[in-house]
């Protein structure tokens, strides 16, 4: 394999490409910097917000800040982002200590812009979902806003050291949100979360330092500078493996997933929405940004492993979800299963499958947030998460049943919903990916289809157990009021893009198509340079 050849140079050139329309660095409005710093600065000002004592003032303040942040990201997309440009846009670079490679560097392309919009959108709805929070509301919304800025920074920064800092910044709010407002086992879930994610994220720091100080030249943590370094095959493989572990925990990849069911099992509804809607997408984004883009030669070697791990995710998590009797854990394992399609798409050398993986992240962000919000709303009424203690509540909660049905159908990839389009793109894209042998493609698509079959079984049976049959005696005295306007509004806001993407996916896919095609094309020269191909890879494939 030609490690120091044209593939790596091409990757560096493409990562650093700034089209003429994108070179409006410091003379245009700093959209991304504002979107990052506004919620963080606003969170610090929460102690100054006047409040009568019931948290109402803080709630409106946090909602206003998150909505403003969302409008800023929309403004960035409409005024400074061109989806036909594959390179970085909305750039802002401010050197700080150039000799140490330290500075502020942000930008957006097709990999990051859709996820920045998703982050600000879900966070706004999470603030609305947190309206019933009365215990320490100032601290709760402080953490929620700080998390918003940190997550946007993960997708926007173009410096690996800044990426590590942003990655770590969002860990602290999640830990505290779990440890303070979680369920009975909140301390265990929060500790497990921080141990898994903090320890694994050390690999990000080690890789960043190793790459910045290797290969000669000035010290820099800029993505484009790191990609331009001439790295040996062994060094590339070590960096790739380390980052795969770090990002695999966040995605999560089986067997690095065990923190997620515990975290979801104890979290409140708004924290659920942020975990499922945004946090998991950070892992998929990072695999695209670093593993697939920065190490094209190593990615060729690891891609079959990603595909196999994706199938394991789909089948194992679907079977485990089928066996769960706890409602939160059932949906949590369903999330792990759906993220398996992201792994298959990233491991594929087909632009269609890779585009499907990107769409799956966006789709699952919306669907996962909606399902977990409904789980929280249902628990507030029934005060139980055990399916054995539910049943027959459909007569008293018809609006809630309608919302559950719509979101469950979206999760099982009903045609006309976003999940159907994204999973179909991954299936068809991988089936037509000439980089892999035909038997391997048949086995992978066939195995993944098992998960697709299991999903409607466990989701529809879940609906039956919650809403149909005889009402359980335990619920006879429960305050089973139907969905209130706030809850209907939140679910409607999530269902509109779910259905819109399902009916016309180009609304979203066009926003990242050029960048995804560029990422996949980077691996073509690496594949052609693979002088000793191994099954299931072919030599010099014709990319679909």
Curated annotation (Swiss-Prot):
GO cellular component labels: plasma membrane-derived thylakoid membrane
One Pfam family hit: Proton_antipo_M
Membrane-spanning residues: 29-49, 60-80, 115-135, 139-159, 161-181, 193-213, 234-254, 268-288, 302-322, 339-359, 360-380, 400-422, 442-462, 488-508
Top EC class, one word: translocase
Annotated compartments: Cellular thylakoid membrane
UniProt xrefs under InterPro entries: NADH_Q_OxRdtase_chain4, NADH_Q_OxRdtase_chainM/4, NADH_UbQ_OxRdtase, ND/Mrp_TM
UniProtKB keywords: Membrane, NAD, NADP, Plastoquinone, Quinone, Thylakoid, Translocase, Transmembrane, Transmembrane helix
EC number(s) stated in the UniProt entry for this protein: 7.1.1.-
Any one GO BP annotation for this protein: ATP synthesis coupled electron transport
Domain of life assignment: Bacteria
Record keyword Thylakoid present: yes
An example Gene Ontology molecular-function term: NADH dehydrogenase (ubiquinone) activity
Topology of the protein relative to the lipid bilayer: Multi-pass membrane protein
Record's catalysed reaction(s): a plastoquinone + NADH + (n+1) H(+)(in) = a plastoquinol + NAD(+) + n H(+)(out); a plastoquinone + NADPH + (n+1) H(+)(in) = a plastoquinol + NADP(+) + n H(+)(out)
Role played: NDH-1 shuttles electrons from NAD(P)H, via FMN and iron-sulfur (Fe-S) centers, to quinones in the respiratory chain. The immediate electron acceptor for the enzyme in this species is believed to be plastoquinone. Couples the redox reaction to proton translocation (for every two electrons transferred, four hydrogen ions are translocated across the cytoplasmic membrane), and thus conserves the redox energy in a proton gradient.
Protein family: Belongs to the complex I subunit 4 family.
Protein name, as recorded: NAD(P)H-quinone oxidoreductase chain 4
Gene: ndhD
